[in-house]
Amino acid sequence: DEAEAKAAPADCVPVAATDPLYILYTSGTTGQPKGVVRDNGGHAVALKWTMKAVYDTDPGDVYWAASDVGWVVGHSYIVYAPLLQGCTTILYEGKPVGTPDAGAFWRVIADHGVKMLFTAPTAFRAIKREDPNAELMRKYDLSRFKILFLAGERTDPDTLHWAENALKRPVIDHWWQTETGWPIASNCMGLHRFPIKPGSPTKAVPGWQVDVLDDAKAIVKAGTIGSICCKLPLPPGTLPTLWNADQRYKDAYLAEFPGYYKTADAGYKDEDGYLYIMARTDDIINVAGHRLSTGAMEEVLASHPDVAECAVIGVADALKGQVPLGFLLLKAGVKRASEDVARDVVQMV
């Protein structure tokens, strides 16, 4: 209180649109963490635009990004974007379960009149595991809650269906990265609402051209897995470089596919142009000459009624080069032997 009483007002300082606003470090699969630079002007323009175009929020709405300010979601959608749009933003310290129970998110939504929640699929998998019938949800008034957005990892169709059935509201999977600062692909709720396809973040957001390329740098046909890349130039708000590492920026993102930004994600487009993010490019495994997506296999495992969470990795095999190895976490209250569930999912794959 004493320090606050002695504090003097600080004037606003004009800065160039291209001046750095912040540096956010993100880990790479190899080497040192990369310091993603965010500039002032493009960042503000892009975030302000997304609040209506993507998230369909208006000034005065209550917006909740259940993330951490140390992550890009926290920077973009706890701090900057909601305030630029004139929304109330919620900063929440807690978990979706255990604080005190799996109704924590519903309590916050009801108490503060949240219109739009943005969180990770893991949060809903945790809620589903602890409260599979969504009984705690029914204790709260969610009448002002309109849309759930999921991002940060691939949303498996089983989690999306569970959330849709429980909430009876749109559940929107969308996709972006620390480097981009705002969504690359989404069903834009404030523009044109496309039919939802489970497993897909829908289509590229205006400003982005997203192509799927093969190792020869050619665009692949629909349904073929390849490297997901964004055509240059990138839209406002994306990273202009890495902090004190211009050459590393070029080598990491621009060199492999000339004329494109390499996302390092793998996936495909369907015949309707919907994008499917299946895995990081280093999560595509080669089994006896066949390129297989661990994400596609995880999707099958997650569809088993007893499975709450799962993961698939590639392990070395003397005959086939690699073989998939799956890990399962069962839902609370499951009585079946884990060996029986394992046999089920092997047959499903």
Regions found by a protein language model. Give the residues of each.
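Conserved pre-ATP/AMP-binding loop-to-beta segment of ANL
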Residues: 2-25, 32, 47, 56-62, ...
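Conserved S/T- and glycine-rich ATP-binding loop of Class I adenylate-forming
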Residues: 20, 26-29, 51, 63, ...
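Adenylate-forming
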Residues: 33-35, 46-53, 106, 124-131, ...
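Active-site glycine-centered loops adjacent to acidic/histidine catalytic or metal-binding residues
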Residues: 68, 152, 176, 202, ...
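AMP-binding/adenylate-forming catalytic core of the ANL superfamily
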Residues: 110, 117, 230, 234, ...
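Conserved ATP/PPi-binding loop(s) of AMP-dependent carboxylate-activating enzymes
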Residues: 203-207, 218-253, 292
